[in-house]
Amino acid sequence: MSTTIDVPESNNVAKEKVLLLGARPRPGGWKKGVAIMDFILRLGAIAAAPGAAATMGTSDQTLPFFTQFFQFEASYDSFTTFQFFVITMALVAGYLVLSLPFSIVVIIRPHAVGPRLFLIILDTVFLTLATASGASAAAIVYLAHNGNQDSNWLAICNQFGDFCAQTSGAVVSSLVSVVIFVLLIVMSALALRRN
């Protein structure tokens, strides 16, 4: 004599579907990786911006010969464009240091929109300042290297080689910080997307 026990089908299938829908992981885990990369890029820009300001601010060369009335000297403070460059890159460096706590908040809370929006707005403002100062200094450095035949401006880099090397290095460093700012803005814009 064998006994059979009939077990009715349970409704666990419907319950499992509901649990699966409710237990979905939150999308956008990649935003934390973007926030970490943002912090690392800010550290790189912190190295580039004050490096540019310090290099330009210390650029000075005096030629070894002089006359009774004249001494031939090239210094960053002889050019108002270079003064603008030093002040602007120092401001950019200060902003980058002050933006680090906000970048850390974005790492801790990658889905927070407020700090990321604040950073993208100020990054755009300081990108504009860094681009303006870098481009204007690049124009003066170009004139120092090549001169301008139409205006009878002579190239001074043949005589002031060290000065021109320092100013060129400062311009390159500022343009590195500009590229980093562009990357920061693009990454923040991607992270602000809803998907």
UniProtKB/Swiss-Prot annotation:
Q: Where in the cell is it found?
A: Cell membrane
Q: What is this protein called?
A: Casparian strip membrane protein 3
User: Which superkingdom heads the taxonomic lineage of this protein's source?
Assistant: Eukaryota
Output the InterPro entries linked to this UniProt entry: CASP/CASPL, CASP_dom, CASPL
Q: Which UniProt keywords apply?
A: Cell membrane, Cell wall biogenesis/degradation, Membrane, Transmembrane, Transmembrane helix
Which residues lie in coiled coils?
A: none
Q: Which residues lie on this side of the membrane: Cytoplasmic?
A: 1-33, 108-116, 191-195
Q: Name one Pfam family in it.
A: CASP_dom
Q: Does the keyword Cell wall biogenesis/degradation apply?
A: yes
Is-annotated flag, keyword Coiled coil? no
Q: How does it sit in the membrane?
A: Multi-pass membrane protein
**Which PANTHER family does this one have?**
CASP-LIKE PROTEIN, CASP-LIKE PROTEIN 1U1
Listed under GO cellular component are: Casparian strip; plasma membrane
For this entry, list what GO says about its biological process.
cell wall modification; cell-cell junction assembly
Complex formation: Homodimer and heterodimers.
Q: Which residues lie on this side of the membrane: Extracellular?
A: 55-86, 138-169
So what family is this one in? Belongs to the Casparian strip membrane proteins (CASP) family.
